[in-house]
Amino acid sequence: MTTRGFSVSHADGVPFERGLRSFFEYRDLGIKAATDGRVVAHVIRAAAGAGFSSRPHRHETSFQLVCVLQGWIEFEYEGQGVVRLLAGSCVHQPPGIRHRELGHSADVEMLEIVMPGDFLTEEVAAVDDDVRAAAVIRAPTD
């Protein structure tokens, strides 16, 4: 039996740090080190006092999953429109999909899992070529 790559991460004493987006803080879960960079997983939360600004962008990934643990966050996705995620909501963002964050609650926390562990983020001019064609998708409130 092998234990290579085994990883356990506990919340106690593990700091959140600023990362890709200045309005979020990230807590590394040790998965990137355990998988030799194939996968990164972190808990993301809103940074206290940070201003919010998100430009349309895309990521060069092979897999990206976001699950909201508490609070809410709203995204605009290419070809999908506006999507609000509440606690318990998950979204798979297909590779290269253009998107932007529109807003989030002060208490938002999310689990994000991305492959590969290091990926390129590229700003783009717009989320959709025709933003008027976008639909609105909202999570149920009941």
Residue ranges and their predicted role:
Residues 43-45, 89, 99:
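Hydrophobic/aromatic beta-strand elements that line small-molecule binding cavities or substrate pockets
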Residues 15-57, 62, 142:
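A short glycine-rich, His/Asp/Glu-containing loop-to-beta-strand
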Residues 43-46, 58-75, 113-116:
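Short, conserved beta-strand element in jelly-roll/cupin
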Residues 1-2, 38:
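Extended interaction-bearing regions that mediate binding to partners or small molecules
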Residues 78-80, 103-104:
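Conserved catalytic-core motifs of eukaryotic protein kinase domains, centered on the activation segment
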Residues 3-10, 17, 100-142:
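Double-stranded beta-helix
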Residues 79-96:
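Short acidic-glycine-tyrosine-enriched beta hairpin
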Residues 25, 97, 106:
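Residues that flank catalytic or metal-binding motifs in active/ligand-binding sites
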